[in-house]
């Protein structure tokens, strides 16, 4: 039996595509031994001065850096150590870690948040991301027959990982040790989004340092960046020969390690700036201190979690859309014709946008209907194929022992509705095109006209009222002045005094009548004329 062509080609070409494992990494160091921090307890509660344990000479120790900039090497090749891939290359820049001309190793990926400037670490990460995306696309786009809902993957996703359970248990144990209330009912929550680790400085009095550190691999470089640092006081700080900041008041203890690479026990890190290190190469310009790293967990009591999840009801009402539109129209009326024009243009623009949205909705309905029609066609083809395959047993329905289902195509109703929507859209577009912004103003005239009469009367009264009032005042004043001028001669004739002749007998009554109403000056001038008669009579 002859093999198919593609199977034969695969069997022939398979040996040529066999991948070979990368060579072992040759980044071992045995001439200069590494040092490790060890704390020994002088008595419970106090930490003695640190001592150092050196590896014996000849002990091979693998050293790799976590970050290597692109300008530090010409080329890099893959190597393997302890079933882990690393990059190896020769240093060409004296300022890079390792030294000029030294062959060093560094990790396959750099840590999150850093870039090597387009080097092999960035390229490896980009390649890995593309592979994951293509794999997900291939899995989700594969056309497989429907076999019901497969919830096994969902169950695997929802199943809690063992390391996560261990992390929660450790956090709860630490909470019971440090909390005075010893809470029994609480919630320990992890954020779904990425958040940086939290740095907690190692206290001055702590008696849980490990005395035995067995390691054959050293990672030089930052492990975590962008830390959240808490309680920056009473720190145990580390200074090197090139450390400049040695007057920090937050440090209560300074430790000077040797010039060789210094590593810390598991669970303790050097924090320099906002980055965490497991090992330092004996030089650091910034101040470093010893710290723990914990995940960004949040601990809630039952009441706190209830208050956080269940928000308090708000008394603020949501404004109703017609009320908002009415308020805009009244505001336009209050600000005059300019406000009305602005409001009208705004509503015209809003109407145009709504018309465009309606067109997009119609297009979406047509697209969905086309997809449904194509899906229905595929289903009908599959049904015919199944009927042909199971024709000897009576067709698909008899073969499955189920009721037969038939597809009733009602796409014509959707097509008619879409046609009606398109006709309405076209009529509305023509109305908007013919009327324009000022045409919409005519639609508002039945509501505006009742207000125009009183408004015009008030405006006319304010404009011409002062002039009319001034004219009335001037007219009344002129008439009063004319009346005064006419009455002035009569008043002068009434005040004139007539002299009585000498041969006329004196009458007391007449004298009184003559001088009655006369001014005092005229009476005084008239008195000498009356004295001779009075003397003669006496």
Swiss-Prot record:
CDD domains: HTLV-1-like_HR1-HR2 (cd09851). Residues 320-340 are annotated as: Fusion peptide. GO terms for biological process: syncytium formation; syncytium formation by plasma membrane fusion. A motif (CX6CC) lies at residues 397-405. Residues 21-443 are extracellular. Residues 496-538 are annotated as: Disordered. Residues 380-396 are annotated as: Immunosuppression. GO terms for cellular component: plasma membrane. Pfam families: TLV_coat. Keywords: Cell membrane, Cleavage on pair of basic residues, Disulfide bond, ERV, Glycoprotein, Membrane, Signal, Transmembrane, Transmembrane helix, Transposable element, Viral envelope protein, Virion. The record marks 317-318 as: Cleavage. Residues 465-484 are annotated as: Essential for the fusiogenic function. Residues 465-538 are cytoplasmic. Disulfide bonds join 186-189, 186-405, 397-404. InterPro entries: TLV/ENV_coat_polyprotein. A motif (CXXC) lies at residues 186-189. Specific enzymatic cleavages in vivo yield mature proteins. Envelope glycoproteins are synthesized as an inactive precursor that is heavily N-glycosylated and processed likely by furin in the Golgi to yield the mature SU and TM proteins. The cleavage site between SU and TM requires the minimal sequence [KR]-X-[KR]-R. This endogenous retroviral envelope protein has retained its original fusogenic properties and participates in trophoblast fusion and the formation of a syncytium during placenta morphogenesis. May recognize and induce fusion through binding of SLC1A4 and SLC1A5. Endogenous envelope proteins may have kept, lost or modified their original function during evolution. Retroviral envelope proteins mediate receptor recognition and membrane fusion during early infection. The surface protein (SU) mediates receptor recognition, while the transmembrane protein (TM) acts as a class I viral fusion protein. The protein may have at least 3 conformational states: pre-fusion native state, pre-hairpin intermediate state, and post-fusion hairpin state. The cytoplasmic region is essential for the fusiogenic function. The 17 amino acids long immunosuppressive region is present in many retroviral envelope proteins. Synthetic peptides derived from this relatively conserved sequence inhibit immune function in vitro and in vivo. The mature envelope protein (Env) consists of a trimer of SU-TM heterodimers attached probably by a labile interchain disulfide bond. Interacts with the C-type lectin CD209/DC-SIGN. Belongs to the gamma type-C retroviral envelope protein family. HERV class-I W env subfamily. This is Syncytin-1. It comes from Pan troglodytes (Chimpanzee). The gene is ERVW-1.
